[in-house]
Amino acid sequence: MPLRMIFMGTPEFSVPTLLALAGAGHEIAAVYTQPPRPGGRRGLDLQKSPVHQAAERLGIPVLTPANFKDAADRQTFRDFGADVAVVVAYGLLLPEEILSGTRYGCYNGHASLLPRWRGAAPIQRAIMAGDRETGMMVMKMDKGLDTGPVALAQSVPIDGMMRAGELHDRLMQVGAVLMTEAMARLESGELPLAPQAQEGVAYAAKISKEETRIDFSRPAAEVHNHIRGLSPFPGAWFELDIAGRRERVKVLASEMSEGEGDPGEVLDHTLGIACGEGAVRLTRLQRAGGKALAAADFLRGTPIAAGARIA
């Protein structure tokens, strides 16, 4: 028998899993997502989340509580009489009453190989740390932060040029397949659960605005990982004097290079930049309010001479 489930998610990352579960024939009684947020060019329009929009296209009822502090919201959740809740990047903490509010509990699709990178930003943190492998896991949620027992996992390699946006899109698809398999096994009573390892725990803290600035005093490999781990969003950046004023420039892609100089020194006409150790080459950049451009195109509109300093 197909499962009766509640789906909980918010960003684009969650949508393929919602679509896959619906396509597998499960009865999705309701979708929970974060409330509409101000958006549009002036921030005056309320914009529904990608999951909200997908659920409406599927004809599934959508609920958008700001939290579950209200007893009425917790009761509404239980009243759906669901077998299971599937959670993928929902963005809200779930109280115990919700975690135990369905027959089989809540199963989460998490974008790392736990216990490494528990928390809010596992995709970015894996690349920023220079990891060569990550993956998706389906786990049964408990009261801790991504500490529940693991049901299924699939690893995904990270090559030295992969950026966070590419890894996001890969894991988004892997996660949909993995969760669909997990729910099929849960339905048949054959879903295994194993406790997470006690060793290798790392936390993927939310990316702060302060750490997005590029620190060229770090070794080139770390600078390169920093850039690709934050691309395309929120974007690593440096400041540059343009037409007499200081302007922020995002770096969306880079590669390892050769050369020596003071950290932040422009080494050549192709944007080789000296780091604390070694050098990186900036290959895709974006000025505030402008389009993302290949380095050669960027330099045609914004010349940066060899010997200049960026920081």
Swiss-Prot record:
Superkingdom per UniProt: Bacteria
State which Enzyme Commission number(s) the record gives.
Answer: 2.1.2.9
Per the record, a Pfam family? Formyl_trans_N
Q: CDD domains from the entry?
A: FMT_core_Met-tRNA-FMT_N, Met_tRNA_FMT_C
- Record bears the keyword ATP-binding: no
The first-level EC class reads transferase
Gene3D superfamilies membership: 3.40.50.12230
The answer to whether the entry has keyword Transcription regulation is no
Q: Which UniProt keywords apply?
A: Protein biosynthesis, Transferase
Q: Which GO cellular component term is one of those annotated?
A: cytosol
Q: Which family does it belong to?
A: Belongs to the Fmt family.
The name under which this protein is listed is Methionyl-tRNA formyltransferase
